[in-house]
Amino acid sequence: MFNPQLNKNGELQHLLTIEGLPKANILHILDTASSFVSIGDREVKKVPLMRGKSVFNLFFENSTRTRTTFEIASKRLSADVINLNIQASSSSKGESLLDTIDNLSAMHADMFVVRHAQSGAPYLIAKHLSDTSQSHVHVVNAGDGRHAHPTQGLLDMYTIRHYKKDFSNLTVAIVGDILHSRVARSDIHALTTLGVPEIRAIGPRTLLPSGLEQMGVRVFTDINKGLKDVDVIIMLRLQNERMSGALLPSAQEFFKSYGLTTERLALAKPDAIVMHPGPMNRGVEIESAVADGTQAVILPQVTFGIAVRMAVMSILAGN
């Protein structure tokens, strides 16, 4: 049976989702990332771990942080980076996803970093590579539909560990549009695997997916109750591009009911940290006083994201 992520030795072959990824693999990625964080402070920000390797970035959806940090991470590992312009590629002329992959593989690709609107697209690519005896080529999921965003989940775990040191006594709240969020799904799976005892999902009923309670998540529709004594707050934007129908009265009403203000932040523990995967919409899910405040670790998340993505690619490349 095709194993989507691990080889027969239990080593990472692709990174497609955090769901089902063993704790040992997650911790290995986080520990490896720790060794890469300081590279950004060096005069020469490079290590030769992927010299001679070709990394193809295939972003079928828009991205700023993920695409840029993957490119920086690849270059800091000394890989050759090819950014495919999807709008100008043959996929805009009707070429199928797998035909695109086959043609790029013929150019001796070593790794594909893929963001796609369709859930499961990275898995499809990984299976195709396995079926066509190209198991030496690795796939990293940079976000697929509403399904998963594993590197964001991993960098969120790195950030939490950096500031809180230990997962075993934490209460983590995820607030906002959880229904459409691949980040929320990846974070919930990672937090569960790492032993976080209490995960809370906070949002209006229309933006909370079914099945959260079965995953061990406590659900709150009252943000004031949900934020009480939490250690970590992960804010999520409204994903209007994925919404169909009127799920909310307005962005202003959402902020009034669920926006993170200084008053609401005060309900959390005094040393609580505030996170956000971006892009951030000020005045919708978070006010500027909180986003720019001392408890926000939103920009460090971006910095840590480079190291985490370096770790993932380095491990996949066999280092």
Curated annotation (Swiss-Prot):
Q: Where does carbamoyl phosphate bind?
A: R65, T66, R115, H149, Q152, G278, P279
Which reaction is the catalytic activity of this chain? carbamoyl phosphate + L-aspartate = N-carbamoyl-L-aspartate + phosphate + H(+)
What molecular function terms (GO) are annotated for this protein?
A: amino acid binding; aspartate carbamoyltransferase activity
Q: In which pathway does it act?
A: Pyrimidine metabolism; UMP biosynthesis via de novo pathway; (S)-dihydroorotate from bicarbonate: step 2/3
Q: What does this protein do?
A: Catalyzes the condensation of carbamoyl phosphate and aspartate to form carbamoyl aspartate and inorganic phosphate, the committed step in the de novo pyrimidine nucleotide biosynthesis pathway.
Q: What is this protein called?
A: Aspartate carbamoyltransferase catalytic subunit
Query: Could you tell me the Gene Ontology terms of the biological process aspect for this record?
Result: 'de novo' pyrimidine nucleobase biosynthetic process; 'de novo' UMP biosynthetic process; amino acid metabolic process
Share what the entry says about its subunit structure, partners included: Heterododecamer (2C3:3R2) of six catalytic PyrB chains organized as two trimers (C3), and six regulatory PyrI chains organized as three dimers (R2).
Task: List, alphabetically, the GO terms of the cellular component aspect.
Answer: cytosol
Q: Which family does it belong to?
A: Belongs to the aspartate/ornithine carbamoyltransferase superfamily. ATCase family.
Query: In the UniProt record, does the keyword Transferase occur?
Result: yes
